[in-house]
A protein has these predicted regions:
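The feature captures the conserved acid-bearing segment of alpha/beta-hydrolase catalytic domains
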Residues: 85-178
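Acidic, Ser/Thr-rich intrinsically disordered and amphipathic helical segments
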Residues: 33, 37, 65-66, 130-133, ...
């Protein structure tokens, strides 16, 4: 049973451990089933003839969390055209890094995936510090392929500027198909 409705576990009293490394509240099995479901949708698109480098997955809030996992630890890690994460968080704590290492040992990853990470500086559901924490991790893993936007005054929502920035990123990431 979760301790709170927040996707980010929060300590109850000072002196308790930092929730950054507390992944026991995350439903790893459920999340990985969601990742596999998204991979099944990608499979169908690839079977229909869509080039993998033209497929972008993305989500807002919990959808962001699952999209980040698809981009980092699924069988499509490094192969997608892009991953979009809006106002979300990176679940499973330190397990993600371990899962990535296991995947790299099994497969040669020629990582081409581009990333768009955006967040509201006034988000009270997923605090800015949590965004900065996972942004640093993803930039460390994915390097210069990560574009980051922080919107002052925006809470756990989207604003026109974010949508415009995402649109511009998609235009750069997915150039027109040459007929």
């Amino acid at each position: 049973m979760p301790k709170s409705f927040s996707p980010i576990p929060m300590p109850k009293r000072s002196g308790e451990p930092d929730p950054e490394d507390n992944d026991e509240d995350d439903d790893e099995d459920g999340m990985m089933k969601s990742v596999e479901y998204i991979c099944g949708l990608i499979d169908k698109e690839v079977e229909a003839g869509v080039p993998i480098e033209r497929i972008v997955v993305g989500g807002f809030s919990q959808g962001c969390a699952i999209s980040l996992l698809v981009g980092l630890v699924s069988r499509y890690s490094g192969k997608l055209g892009g991953v979009v994460g809006l106002s979300g968080y990176l679940p499973l704590g330190e397990k993600v890094g371990k899962m990535m290492e296991e995947r790299k040992e099994r497969e040669k990853n020629t990582a081409q995936t581009k990333w768009f990470l955006a967040h509201g500086a006034r988000d009270q559901l997923v605090p800015k510090r949590e965004f900065m924490r996972y942004q640093d991790k993803i930039e460390g893993w994915e390097g210069e392929r990560v574009e980051v936007k922080l919107y002052e005054g925006m809470g756990h929502a989207t604003v026109g500027a974010e949508v415009r920035d995402l649109y511009g990123w998609l235009e750069k990431t997915l150039p027109e198909i040459q007929a």
